[in-house]
């Protein structure tokens, strides 16, 4: 799912590069991406997706040096009181919760596939769920791949719930050509995406 200010797209938007850059409004070499792999770090099958995603981003013309990998599992819990690390007065950004301002320095956040429940758990544990929601409402583009799209849709009580409909990615049945009714599951085949901008939802 990808998101504009109060908006979102889903599943394989990276397979639609022109649409992606139209949304961002920048040339590929100028685009900065925050990549969140957290949903896919517990199985090798999901980890394979990291290489695929990086290849897709690179083939679109996005520079590797403009992609920051941000794994929520490395971030301290939001209520944890630091002990022996208190001597570190300016922790490196990959080891702490990003601020809204830092998050908004990126043009898009790409949230990978894997286990949506793991992603949701880590979002809540770290408090990043609140940060990313505020950044999206301020204009950050959200691109959810598989589990990342489920987290943004209506699949999880504690997800972003940008749309009320749950999303079922990698659907191997009949390709849908129109959206189902409010609250019903949106079954997306690979290569298809749901795009949300403000109150408008569409298939692309």
Task: List the predicted regions and their residue ranges.
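N-terminal beta1-alpha1 cap of cysteine-dependent amidohydrolase-like domains
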Residues: 1-108
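Active-site-adjacent pocket-lining segments in enzyme domains
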Residues: 105, 111-112, 116-143, 148-204
């Amino acid at each position: 799912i990808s998101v504009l200010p109060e908006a979102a797209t889903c599943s394989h938007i990276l397979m639609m590069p022109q649409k992606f850059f139209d949304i961002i409004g920048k040339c590929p070499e100028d685009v900065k991406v925050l990549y969140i792999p957290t949903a896919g770090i517990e199985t090798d099958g999901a980890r394979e997706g990291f290489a695929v995603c990086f290849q897709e981003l690179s083939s679109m013309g996005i520079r590797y040096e403009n992609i920051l990998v941000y794994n929520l599992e490395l971030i301290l819990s939001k209520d944890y009181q630091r002990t022996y690390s208190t001597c570190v007065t300016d922790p490196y950004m990959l080891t702490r919760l990003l601020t809204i301002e830092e998050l908004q320095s990126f043009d898009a956040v790409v949230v990978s596939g894997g286990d949506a429940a793991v992603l949701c758990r880590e979002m809540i544990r770290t408090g990043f769920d609140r940060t990313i929601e505020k950044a999206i409402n301020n204009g950050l583009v959200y691109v959810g791949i598989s589990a990342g799209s489920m987290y943004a849709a209506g699949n999880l009580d504690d997800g972003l719930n940008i749309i009320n409909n749950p999303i079922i990615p990698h659907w191997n049945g009949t390709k849908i050509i129109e959206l189902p009714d409010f609250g019903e599951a949106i079954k997306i085949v690979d290569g298809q995406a749901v795009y949300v901008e403000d109150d408008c939802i569409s298939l692309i």
